[in-house]
A protein has these predicted regions:
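Non-catalytic, charged/low-complexity accessory segments that flank nucleotide-binding cores
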Residues: 13, 18, 22-26, 157-163
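P-loop NTPase switch module centered on the Walker A-proximal segment
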Residues: 18-124, 128-130, 173, 177-179
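Residue-level "edge-of-site" marker
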Residues: 87, 154, 183
Length: 185
C-alpha cells in the first residue's frame, strides 16, 4: 500500500514546481500535509479533495471513512499510519496531495515523503498550539528547503487566542510567519 509513494519521483518524473509534464500541459506540484497528532490534517485533506471535486463526500477519521486512510488498522484506530496520495486538478495545475502520519511513532514514514515535495502545509491545532513535534517538522522542512504554508486549524474551539498563537508561532518557528487572514475570520 505504501509503494505508491516510494517511486513517485520516477513514476511522475518528479516535475519540478512550475514545469509541465509531457503528457499534459498542466503544471504539476506535489504538496504534503504534515502535523502533530490530532491537529486535523487528514480532515483538512478531505476538505481539499472535496472542494476540488476529487471526492463526492467528505469522510471522517473518527467514522473510519476518510478517503486517504485505507488501511484497516488506520480505520480501526482513527490514525494515519502510511502516507497516501491523491492526484487532482486545480485550475491549471495538477496537484499531488500527500497525507502523512502525525504520530511520532510513524515519523520515518512522514520523512520519506519530504524528498518529493514542492510545498508543505504544516497544520497546527489552534487548541494545542505549537508542539515539540511541530518544531521537529519545521526543522526537517528547513533542512529539505521546502516552502511551507502554516495552517492553523481548530480556531473555533474555546480558549484559542489568535494573537498569542501567532506570537508563539513566530517565536518557536520563524519570525517571518505572516497572517494571511487579514483580520477576517
Amino acid at each position: 500500500k505504501t509503494d505508491s509513494l516510494r517511486n513517485i519521483k520516477e513514476r511522475k518524473g518528479h516535475i519540478p514546481m512550475g514545469e509541465t509534464s509531457g503528457n499534459n500541459k498542466k503544471k504539476h506540484i506535489c504538496i504534503a500535509m504534515l502535523a502533530h497528532v490530532d491537529a486535523g490534517k487528514t480532515t483538512l485533506s478531505e476538505s481539499l479533495l472535496y472542494l476540488c471535486g476529487k471526492i463526492r463526500k467528505m469522510g471522517r477519521v473518527d467514522h473510519g471513512d476518510a478517503y486517504l486512510d485505507t488501511f484497516d488498522l488506520e480505520r480501526e484506530r482513527g490514525i494515519t499510519i502510511f502516507s497516501k496520495q491523491a492526484v487532482f486538478p486545480m485550475g491549471d495545475l495538477e496537484v499531488t496531495l500527500l497525507d502523512t502520519p502525525g504520530h511520532v511513532d510513524f515519523s520515518a514514514e512522514m520523512e520519506r515523503t519530504l524528498q518529493v515535495l514542492d510545498y508543505a502545509v504544516l497544520v497546527i491545532s489552534g487548541a494545542d498550539g505549537v508542539q515539540g513535534h511541530t518544531q521537529t517538522l519545521w526543522r526537517l522542512l528547513e533542512r529539505y528547503q521546502i516552502p511551507v504554508f502554516i495552517f492553523i486549524n481548530k480556531m473555533d474551539q474555546e480558549g484559542t487566542d489568535k494573537e498569542a498563537l501567532l506570537a508563539d508561532v513566530r517565536k518557536r518557528l520563524s519570525e517571518n510567519c505572516i497572517d494571511f487572514t487579514n483580520g477576517q475570520e
